[in-house]
Amino acid sequence: MDFVPRLNSVLTLVLSGLWHFGLTATNCDNCDDPLASFLSLRAFSSSSDVTGSSSPAHLNWRMGTGGWSPAYSNAQQWLQIDLGNRVEITAVATQGRYGSSDWVTSYRLMFSDTGHNWQEYKQEDNIWTFVGNMNADSVVHHKLLHSVRARFVRFVPLKWNPDGKIGMRMEVYGCSYRSDVADFDGHSSLLYRFNQKTMSTLKDMISLKFKSMQGDGVLLHGEGQRGDYITLELQNGRLALYLNLDGGQARLSSIAPSAILGSLLDDQQWHSVLLERVGKQTNFTVDTNTEHFQIKAETDALDIDYELSFGGIPIPSKPGTFLKKSFHGCIENLYYNGVNIIDLAKRRKHQIYSGNVTFSCSEPQIVPITFVNSRSSYLLLPGTPRIDGLSVSFQFRTWNEDGLLLSTELSESSGTLLLILEGGTLRLLIKKVAGHGTEIITGSGLNDGLWHFVSINARRNRVTLTLDNDAASLPPDISWLQIYSGNSYYFGGCPDNLTDSQCLNPIKAFQGCMRLIFIDNQPKDLISVQQGSLGNFSDLHIDLCSIKDRCLPNYCEHGGHCVQTWTTFYCNCSNTGYTGATCHDSIYEQSCEVYRHRGNNTSGFFFVDSDGSGPLEPLQLYCNITEDKIWMTIQHNITELTQVQGSNAEKPYSMTLNYGGSMDQLVALIDGSEYCEQEVTYHCRRSRLLNTPDGAPFTWWIGRSNEKHHYWGGSVPGIQKCGCGLEQSCLDIGHFCNCDADTDEWANDTGFLSFKDHLPVTQIIITDTNRSNSEAAWRIGPLRCYGDRHFWNAVSFSTEASYLHFPTSHVEFSIDISFFFKTTALSGVFIENLGIKDFLRLELSSPSEVTFAIDVGNGPTELLVQSPSPLNDNQWHYIQAERNLKETSLQVDNFPRIMRETTEKGHFQLQLNSQMFVGGTSSRQKGFLGCIRSLHLNGQNIDLEERGMVTSGVRPGCPGHCSSYGNNCHNGGKCVEKHNSYSCDCTKSPYEGPFCQKEISALFDSTTSITYMFQEPYPVSKNTSTSSSAIYTDTVLSKETILLSFVTAQAPTLLLYLNFSTPSFLALLLSRNGSLQILYHLSKGESHMFTVSTENLANRRVHHVKMNRDGTELSIQMDQQLFSYNFPLEAEFLTVRSLILGKVTETLGLDPRVARANSLGFIGCLSSVQYNHIAPLKAALRHASIAPATVQGSLREFSCGSMVDSDVNAVTTVYSSSDPFGKTDDHDPLTNAVLSDSAVIGGVIAVVTFITFCVIGIMTRFLYQHKQSHCTSQKKEKEYSENLDSSFRHDIDLQSTTSKCKREYFI
């Protein structure tokens, strides 16, 4: 490839580009000359004039009528000026009519090159309304935000002095405008031939303006023989860019465009295009919309052979023919890399070869009309009545699915003809007076905003409906059909004062544009309609198509699909993971911790959206919510132990890990966590890992920033060591990794990487497995993190003058703010951010009111949420405020969301330039006193604590979380304050888990017995209260509480048994019929039996029992039923000595009623057992080594709540001889038999226990001796891939015997 042409093209691009843009800037700086002051009277025209002829309307004009005033003051009036040539307009000014009370208070501007097909001036993508005058003499000047180029300017009054009439004097400011224009008729093109065979460019800049008469056509094309190409092509009114830098790809006809921008580009208005390319980086701009993208290619150069064509792609072998549809319209100021192509063509330079191209823009005089109102817009045009047949044709475009296009009453009682757009489909209906009717249905999706041609032709009994050159007809055998044309044709809708027979509209009026209306093959002059000399109309814009694409740009965020009508747009957020009017709000939480805080207590896979409404997509990961620390786990694509052989420095082994998300997503999750880790394992045999600290490493890993890291698990960044190197416990003291000992036996280095700035591991490289007998295996565990740094990020404001400030909020279209607050103050400002005119403010305006005020330049919008209870109660409350293009909303806690629709007129971009104040205002007044936590702006966390550390009057953190969240600790759990959160202490609860909600339950069989001895409390918690020891004294208990849940199919059976200080006891049992009975045997020998429920509770269902005794009053809750009993006043209740669950093994002296229920033990499931502050079942299962609880028989932990019949049956099938789930014997069990069986079982247990102790003693001595003569090492349980051979797995398992007594510790 020749370097010189490429260098020359780059220099030409840079120098000519600088000259071109410098010249443009110079012209713009001086473009403020008055353009209308010296124009003659003929330059002015108007809709009407009070004098009957045109009046001068120059600024400061005092002669004659002193300016322009129309004959009628209504919304149809306008004042127009012809500037003679296309000029650049930068400003306008107005006055009222001199010496009168006539002036305009607001108006719109329209522009045109031809005096037809007007374009309304827009600002911020809205039709702009200018503020007019307040009197007749003062001048109101407006600098246009962006200049326009036009010959004709039209002022359209909207409002005027209510005590006067419309009156106006005006001036237009700007400068002359020069341009080079080429006109293409759809069958012509310009060819720009290169001086050399191939033009190879590293940079390209192409700029042009175009005005198109149709929606399709090629603007530019060039290609090279090796496959490079560049094409700009109009497709359905949008501009597509095709750009390829690599040869060999598919051709233009079979590939998708690199980018596609714009909409409604066939509106016969000027549109600008700018294409900038530097290597693979490309900026593509159409009007005000820009798309940046990177070309997927190996090279940076664009190689074009021979020529570039503009306006079409001619076929060299067939003159006058083109490869694709050619462009029909005008192109202006066409520059290719600084070369003015049209100027070369006008001067007939040898590089340019032109077809039938002219150098002035010829435009057809097409007059469009706009139907504005869906209720009252219509156009009435006359026809020629009583003609045998009918012919009507026109073009229309709209976004609405439904609307009336045409209604006409036919002559000679031949019925009514209707043309309706319904559901985007065209329906032609002919209704006869006699009740006959027929229809034609054609087309679909006609509400796509494109121009569609419709033609109706009827002759005798034949009717043809043509849509976009596709004809559909009625069946020819309709004998009753005879059509005679009527004298009135209603387009778009019907007037209110007509009868149904004159104009029928079974659907709403049409909103959209029409043009080229023909009736009886004659065109209709719509300018005559505007002047009142033809037909009639209502709510029309004539000589203007004001269609607007509300989905460009697409304000639906996060991939939401934009759907529009004529007046508004909607966002379809299906399958995006987001919700809201513009798909702004994520439906997922920002961390696993927030999920649990919102009440989700089940571990599993969740989608986590770390930046909320920000640009990052949600990522699916696993949340372990049931533990105290909430771990999130992100797995990658390689989970098994992977064997490596045959790698060296010249041919390294490399493996890349894929976590199922982007690096930005992973980094956001890691940075938002308190702690993260990844376990890395390297098994080796004659395969070195890191070498010596001074030597080049043999293995390394790549982290988040694509950097090499030369430390291993258990070590820290900056030192080339493994974990054993830090602990000085490696196999060879001369190395800092076990594998660096380079032995013939298997060794391993395993540990955790926990430096967050380096995580996650994205790649591993191994280079030392190519020597004799050298091999290795590696495993990298999942990324695991816990803790949410954002959710508990809080500050406290101690003075009203204190505040935090942050950089201004650079948001324009959508903004959402969310945070928690708590306070005792009466009022205070949470957040304030100001602009020149715009602002936003969130404040506590009263103890029970929150106000959100925002102004984008159209006047403030204020939302107020009133709480039924005070918000200054020192509890945490949540606020979410949002403003987007569709609505403004405010929500406090779970109160109803307050919403107000956003106006689509005027400003819609929020422009702020001051710092964002949190907790106060710039004036240091109305500051907030209290705490603000978890502040997010558009999903991004605002680090309050970091700024609070260095700000006077503000301190990081906020104590007192238990006051708001203490009720999250259930079942007797106690809320414990932490610095930046809280936790639940479940010591005195029969439950466990983060919120004391996880039941502790177990399966019992007939031999199971748990005996809990009430002595001094066991030390399961350092926070055990001294008051809890009260139940261990010998004093009489005045109160007691018993809780338990059970599942069984056995009756009778004993649920719980309490031994008191004397032979007194308390028993909870099921009688033979399954009813619950409570038996009290008190100190003086009296017994009290309470039958709580006659229902059979031995029904394999979970039942809950809660018993409270306060003195002599006893209340029992059985499931949802509540029972009350009373003891005699002299009843005495002593201290409990022991509590037994399951079978009572000491049966001597047992009450016969208890013995009967105890005979077969308890078979079933018990859960959540509690006596006062003691949880005996929990103590036996969780603290067996220190709790005074003894377990005999089989005890298996199990969830009663998930128990099914098969689980219950599995426990009971062993005892078939006396199956309690079978038919119940009517007779009582034989007490002697029970006692005999118990004695036998007791003897067997004693023998087995003695033998067990003997075996344990012998094994203990043997192991002790073995330990003295052999070194042992701990080995972690391993998982191996099925594809590893058995010898390899066996060798790894033998590592513990070759460790030479070295032990490796990991952080």
Curated annotation (Swiss-Prot):
It holds the Pfam family EGF. Glycans are attached at N283, N497, N600, N624, N637. Residues 181-361, 368-545, 793-958, 1019-1200 form the Laminin G-like domain. InterPro entries: ConA-like_dom_sf (IPR013320), EGF-like_Ca-bd_dom (IPR001881), EGF-like_dom (IPR000742), FA58C (IPR000421), Fibrinogen-like_C (IPR036056), Fibrinogen_a/b/g_C_dom (IPR002181), Galactose-bd-like_sf (IPR008979), Laminin_G (IPR001791). Residues 25-1238 are extracellular. One of its GO terms (biological process) is cell adhesion. Residues 585-792 form the Fibrinogen C-terminal domain. It is found in: Membrane. GO terms for cellular component: basement membrane; cell junction; membrane. Keywords: Cell adhesion, Disulfide bond, EGF-like domain, Glycoprotein, Membrane, Repeat, Signal, Transmembrane, Transmembrane helix. GO terms for molecular function: calcium ion binding. Gene3D superfamilies: 2.60.120.1000, 2.60.120.200, Galactose-binding domain-like, Laminin. It is a single-pass type I membrane protein. Residues 1-24 form the signal peptide. Disulfide bonds join C31-C175, C330-C361, C513-C545, C551-C562, C556-C571, C573-C583, C931-C958, C962-C975, C969-C984, C986-C996, C1165-C1200. Residues 31-175 form the F5/8 type C domain. Residues 547-584, 959-997 form the EGF-like domain. Residues 1260-1307 are cytoplasmic. The chain crosses the membrane at residues 1239-1259. May play a role in the correct development and proper functioning of the peripheral and central nervous system and be involved in cell adhesion and intercellular communication. PANTHER family: CONTACTIN-ASSOCIATED PROTEIN-LIKE 5, PIKACHURIN-LIKE PROTEIN. Belongs to the neurexin family. This is Contactin-associated protein like 5-3. It comes from Rattus norvegicus (Rat). The gene is Cntnap5c.
